[in-house]
């Protein structure tokens, strides 16, 4: 298991949920919900601020695939957002399968007694926790990083993957 805090990113149309791991990759905890900025880059800037605050070594972006494994419009959106993050930072960015993370988050919140109206502010954070916890468990079991590394568009000879 690699050492270093990871920051999970659950990309939604209106909001982006963030969750972080401890440096040893044992547990994921919610951080905050960032408003989506479709017209600008305030969302990317905020995510990178949080990453710097926690001394993040990797960004884990959830990749929403259909149950069949096929790409959807949300898949394309998450991939585009992951590329924007990768182009804006030296931190590694990985795309990790997140099928059913939002459904699992809704179920967990409902089981904890939160109705659908009370879920809205935290649902994206809980989904990010589920994405990150799954990624951490997958890495522990497989012995290698989960998902796919997102390449950067600009060439930087000092960057190490």
UniProtKB/Swiss-Prot annotation:
Organism: Clavibacter sepedonicus
Pfam families: RuvX
Family recorded in the similarity comment: Belongs to the YqgF nuclease family.
Keywords annotated in UniProt: Cytoplasm, Hydrolase, Nuclease, Ribosome biogenesis
EC number: 3.1.-.-
UniProt-annotated stretches for the region Disordered: 142-161
InterPro entries: RNaseH-like_sf, YqgF, YqgF/RNaseH-like_dom, YqgF/RNaseH-like_dom_sf
Any GO CC annotation of this UniProt entry: cytosol
Record lineage: Bacteria, Bacillati, Actinomycetota, Actinomycetes, Micrococcales
Function: Could be a nuclease involved in processing of the 5'-end of pre-16S rRNA.
Keyword Zinc-finger tagged: no
Protein name, as recorded: Putative pre-16S rRNA nuclease
